[in-house]
UniProtKB/Swiss-Prot annotation:
Lineage per the UniProt record: Bacteria, Pseudomonadati, Pseudomonadota, Gammaproteobacteria, Enterobacterales
Keyword Cell membrane among UniProt keywords: yes
Compartment(s) of residence: Cell inner membrane
Name listed for the protein in its UniProt record: UPF0283 membrane protein KPN78578_12740
Membrane topology category: Multi-pass membrane protein
Transmembrane segments: 70-90, 99-119, 213-233
Organism for this UniProt entry: Klebsiella pneumoniae subsp. pneumoniae (strain ATCC 700721 / MGH 78578)
NCBIfam families the UniProt entry points to: hyp_HI0043 (TIGR01620)
Keyword Cell membrane: yes
Keyword annotations from UniProtKB, A to Z: Cell inner membrane, Cell membrane, Membrane, Transmembrane, Transmembrane helix
Superkingdom in the source lineage: Bacteria
């Protein structure tokens, strides 16, 4: 059976010829240009965030000006003068047998000694926090090194700082997996796979618990002032526990420095991740229409607490993130939403009973 003939199609105008794009002329490289040629390097999002964070840190870091040096020198001279005057008063009180003045000099010396000891302790703790950043840079260099012999002692020092005993199962597995012929990169990678996840899991549990408490507190409490005080207290406590977990003892100034670094990182480097992780998921699931305003505020506060905990982990952790071991905000988000839904369902079923 033959198919029917199709009707003829008439075009209004003539067919246009296909346009051939003009070709660029060939470029010949000489020997010098060919040797120095390098492809353009692609800049990733993490590198852009790191560059922006470095710029902000350099802007906020106080510069050592001449006036600051003059003030420091004046304070040093004043301190030496006070000590010299105290020694002279003590000698005069001893010679004249003025026991009341001598007792005052001894009490002042004890107070000054306690203050100097406190400042020395704070400086040591602040130095320990800065040293952790150097250890992280050293570990990053070892992860790209093929040398042999330095990584084992370095990892043993990290385990000792974290309070892990030599008989710990994770350390025993690490000792069984390494041998003398392995490079520093392989030894540090094994430590990051076998030992470091033990501490990271504990830090994750601390972050999950603090984020859940912040979420439920905001969702239930009707007082905004109480909410703010509770969240601030829980966030400071979370930073302290994470720092202690990774073997860092925080003092007053070191705690302020760590809190400043965490907030700086969240404000300038974490905005894009927060929008990407939270905004798209909320738009897709339409949670704003399902939950009340207080519940939505609770989830937001819990996510900010989780974000703060993740950045505290990153600053206190002795090793850089490798592959996909960095905790994601989406994991904590799903936990918070599930816990909040369970709490709301329980609160609705109680009046019915």
């Amino acid at each position: 059976m033959s198919e029917p003939l199709k009707p003829r199609i008439d075009f209004d105008g003539p067919l246009q010829a296909e346009k051939i794009p003009p070709l660029k002329g060939a470029r010949a490289f000489d020997t010098l240009e060919a040797d120095n040629f390098a492809p353009a390097r692609l800049v990733t999002g993490e590198e852009e965030e790191g560059a922006a964070e470095a710029v902000v840190e350099s802007v906020l870091r106080p510069k050592r000006s001449l006036w600051r040096r003059m003030v420091s020198a004046g304070l040093a001279i004043f301190g030496v003068s006070v000590v010299a005057q105290g020694v002279q008063w003590t000698a005069n009180a001893w010679q004249t047998q003025d026991w009341i003045a001598l007792g005052g000099c001894v009490a002042g010396a004890l107070i000054v000694g306690a203050g100097v000891g406190s400042l020395a302790t704070e400086w040591r703790r602040l130095w320990r926090l800065r040293q952790r950043a150097h250890e992280r840079d050293e570990a990053r260099d070892m992860l790209h090194s093929h040398a042999v012999g330095k990584a084992k002692a370095f990892c043993e020092k990290l385990a000792q700082q974290a309070g892990l005993d030599q008989s710990h199962p994770a350390l025993q597995r690490w000792y069984a997996a390494i041998h003398e012929t392995q490079s520093d990169r392989e030894v540090v990678s094994l430590y990051a796979q076998l030992v470091q996840p033990v501490l990271d899991a504990q830090a994750r549990r601390e972050i999950s618990r603090s984020a859940a408490e912040s979420t439920l507190m905001i969702a239930v409490s009707p007082l905004a002032l109480v909410d703010m005080a509770f969240i601030a207290w829980r966030n400071l406590r979370l930073i302290n526990r994470i720092a202690t977990l990774y073997g860092i003892e925080l003092g007053y100034y070191s705690r302020l420095r760590l809190f400043r670094l965490v907030l700086l990182n969240i404000a300038f480097a974490g905005a894009s991740e927060l929008v990407r992780e939270v905004g798209m998921d909320w738009m897709s699931q339409d949670l704003a229409a399902r939950l009340s305003a207080r519940a939505a505020q609770g989830i937001g506060a819990g996510l900010l607490t989780a974000r703060l905990g993740i950045k505290a982990m990153e600053l206190c952790r002795p090793l850089p993130w490798i592959a996909d071991d960095k905790p994601r905000l989406g994991d904590f988000r799903r936990e918070l939403i599930g816990q909040l839904k369970e709490t709301l369902q329980k609160s609705k079923t109680r009046p019915e009973k």
